[in-house]
Amino acid sequence: MTSPSGTLELHELVLPAHANHRGTLFAGEGLRLMAKAAFLAARGLAQREAVMAAVTGVQFLSPVALGQQLLLRAWVSRVGRSSMTVCVTGLSESPGTPPEEVLKGVFEMVAVDGKGRPSPAKR
């Protein structure tokens, strides 16, 4: 779900296909999910396609076990002419336990036109 302010929530269930050999969320899969949330938040705010220009920071704070739900929250914290900074946090949720912040990252996204060139982000 995306709001007009560029905030998005994405829910994912950690399945065996997402796990590493230790039975927890594979870091590459966590990064993929954060990138997906960043893209959707940027595209929703800009009202046009967006591409990733950079990942300026990612932290994996705690392991996420199989069967846990991952709630990703992404929001646009800065809008330039065509570029946007998107912050993403990930909360791990299990029945009967309070949510725990397990992932966070910052992504630089760029709004693009139909030819893939930078284009003004609609605000």
Identify the residue ranges that each predicted region occupies.
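HotDog/MaoC-like acyl-thioester-processing domains
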Residues: 3-10, 65-66, 77-123
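Hot-dog-fold acyl-thioester-processing enzymes
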Residues: 1-54, 110-123
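Short, solvent-exposed polar/charged micro-motifs at secondary-structure junctions
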Residues: 24, 61-62
